[in-house]
Amino acid sequence: MRSTYKTIGLWVILIVLFVAFYNFFSQGNDQVQEPSFTQLLTKVEEKKVQEVAVKGNTYSGKFTDTSEKFRTTGPAPDAAMLNQLRSNGVDVKYEREEQNSLWLTILGQWMPVVFLFLFFIFFMRQLQGGSGKAMTFGKSKAKLLSESHNKVTFADVAGADECKEELEEIVAFLKDPKKFTKLGGRIPKGVLMMGSPGTGKTLLARAVAGEAGVPFFSISGSDFVEMFVGVGASRVRDLFEQGKKNAPCIIFIDEIDAVGRHRGAGLGGGHDEREQTLNQLLVEMDGFESNDGVILIAATNRPDVLDPALQRPGRFDRRIVVPRPDVKGRLGVLKVHTRRVPLAPEVDLEVIARGTPGMTGADLENLVNESALMAARQNKERVDLSDFEAAKDKVFMGPERRSMIMTEKEKKNTAVHEAGHALLAKLLPGCDPLHKVTIIPRGQALGVTWSLPTEDKVNGYKKQMLDQISMAMGGRIAEELMFNEMSSGAANDIERATETARAMVCRWGMSEKMGPLAFGKSDGEVFLGRDFNSSKDYSEDTARQIDAEVRNIVVGCYERGKNLLTENIEALRRVSDALVEYETLDAEDVNILLQGGQLTRERPPPRVNAPPKATEKKDKRKILDALEGLPAMEPKKA
């Protein structure tokens, strides 16, 4: 409230000063002549003076011919002068002479300076967020989190048990340090959490803040860098000064790769503001001055670009990898996020956990949220299994685009393409089990064939790779067999098949001709601090052999898939016809069709393309009529 009154008062003062400033400088803007006293008397004799106001020795008035004002000084008026003025028809007025106040004179002279000074102070206060300090660019932007602010505990974290144990030990050290120091141990100075986006690194840090019971400072890595040189290093110093004053405490830096990338490499030059900030951070973490009681926790999903000096023991003593959750972890995450969601009795979270391999904690939270939104959209009291299935389809494959207009030819081609993928997924043993196939456009795809593994996979095997390449080419093969034509819809399939084959040859040593060798190195992104001058470690002849081997693998898988689909051409036709009729088939539907059965479930409502409007038909007819009357264009002569 006091801040509001101060702001209102400051605005009132500024407005008053502005009005006074304007009035002061607006005085005398009218055109006023200053003739000599002799010239004034001549004008009087010529009867060109309308009126004269006498104020001491000052004569002011207005001319008759030009209506312009004048002001001049002369001797004190006497009787002869007054008679001369009256005889020439001049209206004479007397005005009392006033003494100017000294304070008014000083105010008029110093008012512009005071106004500019107050305006500058007001501008700086607004620029600095009203902190009242002249310059606060070098101050840390770390936020001190209170215990009651969105409190998260380790009970809210699931799917990362080993990471929780490491961080719980940090919390235990802060609560009872003697338990560890009596045996000569010391508290870790820093903890670096690494993992894919969405695995729960920031959530773990929030859990530490809720459990530690000590001051917790939170800041982002990008908050250190500004356009002013030296600001980042100053903010690092200020951050650790705050930490020392509040020790024991925890400092959390999110996305530390924004400030902790490799030094002295990349296209950005050898020395810049980020490197200066990083150098100061290295000194503060482990320099001559000790930071006892200040624990630094950082999170990043790009550990490969961090500077080696930042990751050494003494700065980050512990490096915790936060992985994607397995089946058990996904079940725990689902239980955490469904605590406030009413579930139908048939919903089995363990089944959902098994059907969502590769999903992170953030993905699962989004899945639960989408399921709840879909149930609410249909006015349901509880979230049932169909809502989870629909949400899973939306998260994995993208939202449906039922309004997209497709011709019958495009629809049939898409059905044949997806039927080729689905049929090879059922026939090849190395492919993941088929889950669903649809020709409803989703995301950027016209159709989707979705396979789900039955368990989490750690390694890939050669036979599986070859089967996956054959399945990826199944869409192109089916188009060739059914229509004797090729479309551009297989572009992404061909790209994935080629990438897999090249990785088999160059990275995994799965080529019999090239042997168990690795060819080439990953150059990395030069802007991320990687080496700019990197070269191939093999000859041009070897490169030609690699290209030939990649081609042999892809073409061999193509021919294998073509033979399988040729042998099962009737099954391919049944699946494609069912896709045209039903638009979406699950694994059970495909099994029925492969066994020669017929589907008996209800058909979806047809998607009818909207007919053109009458006005559109008239406009098109006018254009065609106009074109018929034009002469044919002749080719230009060279």
Curated annotation (Swiss-Prot):
Its cofactor is Zn(2+). GO terms for biological process: protein catabolic process; proteolysis. Acts as a processive, ATP-dependent zinc metallopeptidase for both cytoplasmic and membrane proteins. Plays a role in the quality control of integral membrane proteins. It is a multi-pass membrane protein. It comes from the Bacteria. The chain crosses the membrane at residues 8-28, 103-123. Residues 29-102 are periplasmic. PROSITE patterns: AAA. Its main location: membrane. The active site is at 418. It comes from Myxococcus xanthus (strain DK1622). Binds 1 zinc ion per subunit. Homohexamer. Zn(2+) binds at residues 417, 421, 493. This is ATP-dependent zinc metalloprotease FtsH. Gene3D superfamilies: 1.10.8.60, 3.30.720.210, P-loop containing nucleotide triphosphate hydrolases, Peptidase M41. In the central section; belongs to the AAA ATPase family. GO terms for molecular function: ATP binding; ATP hydrolysis activity; ATP-dependent peptidase activity; metalloendopeptidase activity; zinc ion binding. Its EC number is 3.4.24.-. InterPro entries: AAA+_ATPase, AAA_lid_3, ATPase_AAA_core, ATPase_AAA_CS, FtsH, P-loop_NTPase, Pept_M41_FtsH_extracell, Peptidase_M41. Residues 1-7, 124-638 are cytoplasmic. ATP binds at residues 195-202. GO terms for cellular component: plasma membrane. Residues 614-625 have a biased composition (Basic and acidic residues). Residues 596-638 are annotated as: Disordered. It is found in: Cell inner membrane. Keywords: ATP-binding, Cell inner membrane, Cell membrane, Hydrolase, Membrane, Metal-binding, Metalloprotease, Nucleotide-binding, Protease, Transmembrane, Transmembrane helix, Zinc.
